[in-house]
Amino acid sequence: MNSKLALMPLLIMSAFSYAADEATPETPVQQQLQEVNVRADAKRVKAARSYSIASDGDLRDRVNLGVLGKANAFTAPITVVNYDEQALNNTEARTLVDAVAKKDASVWQFGGESNTLTGLYFRGYQLDARQFSVNGLAGMYGTQGTASVQVGSAQLIKGASTAVNGMDPEGAVSGSVNIETKKAADEGNRKIGLGWFSNNRAQGTFDLGQRFGENKEFGVRANGKLRHGDTPRHGYSEDNKEFALNADYRGEKVRVAFDSIYAKRKTNGGRARMQDIQNANGRLFDAPEGKVNLAPSWQAQNTRGQTNMLTFEWDAFENAQITGGIGYNNARYYGNFASPTVTSSGLTYNSGRARLTDQRFKTLSMNLTARGEFETGPVSHNWSTAFDRIDRKRTTYQGARQTRSSVIDPSIDIPTQLAKLDSNLGSAWNPTPSLDTVIKVNSLAVSDTLGFADNKYRLTLGGRFQAVEQKNKLNGRKADASRFSPMLMAAWVPQPDLVVYGNYMEDLEPSDIRTDDDGHVTMADPRVSRQFEVGVRKNWGDFVTTLNAFQIKRPGYWRGNTTSGTDFAARKNAGLAYSGSEQGIERSRGIEFNTYANLLNKTLRPTFGLMYLQSTVKDYPNFADNLVNGVQVANPRVIAKAGVEWDTPFAKGLTLNGNVSYFGKSYQDTQKQYAFPSYTLVDIGARYKTKLGKNTLTVSSSVENLFNKNYWQVQRGQYDRSFAVVGMPRTYWLKAELDF
């Protein structure tokens, strides 16, 4: 099967002879809002101007929709949000996930600055940082990554998107993130910065870029960030290093870019996540003050990632373009790890036994895409075909471990109790890995966007065929499976400022390898999650509104770790179940509303987002191998976020800003016996820009969690596992940047 897929790049290339013969030489007349079609030549592909004066740079319209190509977010038949470099720089979040989760109500982060375990939730489903793509290449961000220095834009595609972006080697549901790297601007980039963050962290940054050549064809840009010191949480410190180098060439028909990215973050006391709260027979104890650490400072973790990639665009014909790339990421997450676990009462927790752990990820990613356009009578066609391959090797080594753990009582001074824990783990490592797997994913995608009635009606048909290979190198077991994921999208554009859209898409996750009684090794077909979505966008001139509704269904599956006394054991003995087999369903239904504006002569920029989410499970296997019905854990029912920026009339160059985020209550168990309480966070800030001769000085500051709210940042794991991290306390920061 994979030998056939390996020939797909040749098939893609051969498609051009037909496309060239069928092309019409005339350049079609373009209207501003009707740029949704994937245009193949350089001028049209790059013509991604903003279609609304409400766009202030934070929510740019130009997005990369994978196999569909570069399009306009306003007219896209799926829900996508794009945060550009300006937005990330203004928030000055210490991690990428903290930055992109600031405004959109259907997206919230786990980890980030509060914990070294890092990722996002889309509509109630988890996406780990290692599943982010960079420049369209999957898996290039790195495990538990937090770096932002290389990010020119971060694009959030909501909903099942396997057909659009391909399947991550480890599977993902309900969303994807693509990062576009920074490139040198025409006018050059010359910026240095200094920053301070509470409790006592210093930061230095640089951004240097220049273009060369008669038409500025060649560009080089280097970025760096160093941050070191103590966070506002006691016993939690970080040493952060981020560097990025981009070199690009943009010719008349060919554009090529090379990126090299390095990031390393060392933390002490930064992994205090409370686990398996669903097992408690009482409500979890109240969140302590944000400055309180639930883990000792000697528990240290490191994340390190190195990425090198090459990408290109070639305008092969007037009406057809080839794009592609190849990248390699080498990432590690290592240190001494413990897993604090709530006790049965919910009023105390077990500190866990810290253990030396080294997780290593090596990912090779490549793709080749062809896209173009032609017409058949009154119908326009924007076609695309893409081949993707991802290889990931994942290895985990473990070493010495604490001999015992302790029960910690939060009603008594926590630091005093943590100080009594034995920090002498030893230094011995087991030379045999505890996990050693290789996952390979080959896929071929095709799509055609048909335009009717002067492109007022648009129908996208297509899908992606994917073949997954998985090998366990410890026991030699290997298996493969494949599936075709269809894609159906539609958009109605009755007028240039109104778009009504809908879609059906799927997400895939690899199944477990199973050995039958006769010794035959197999892998079940990939697990399929299905999404239906409808939405409407309206451009009112100085503000834009989006309203959409969605449903996502994801199959459950048996953990299969028990032999008696459970629903799984009974069904296995009856021949009705095995470890990893599908059982039951979890369903998320929701409504989202988002709006952003640019008012008062572009001096007032408010944003608002609201999501209502219902997450339920039916006949769903839990972590204990029993079937449950009820709500899915740790998913807030209501999330609302509002923000504003105001360019003050009384002080030229002064901008004031603020954000309010509300997270409704969620539940720590499927039976709704015990709830995580709701909470509201408030941030305020200011930015002042002034001229120093020919240079520009920008001074920014902010207070995050202004009212020092104590709260649990909830998370969910596999099955019905519910986790929580103590939210960060009030945090101050100040930075100055000089453009010269």
Specify the residue positions occupied by each region the protein language model found:
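Transmembrane beta-barrel wall of Gram-negative outer-membrane proteins
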Residues: 189-272, 298-315
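Face-selective signature of the C-terminal outer-membrane beta-barrel domain
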Residues: 308-331, 353-474
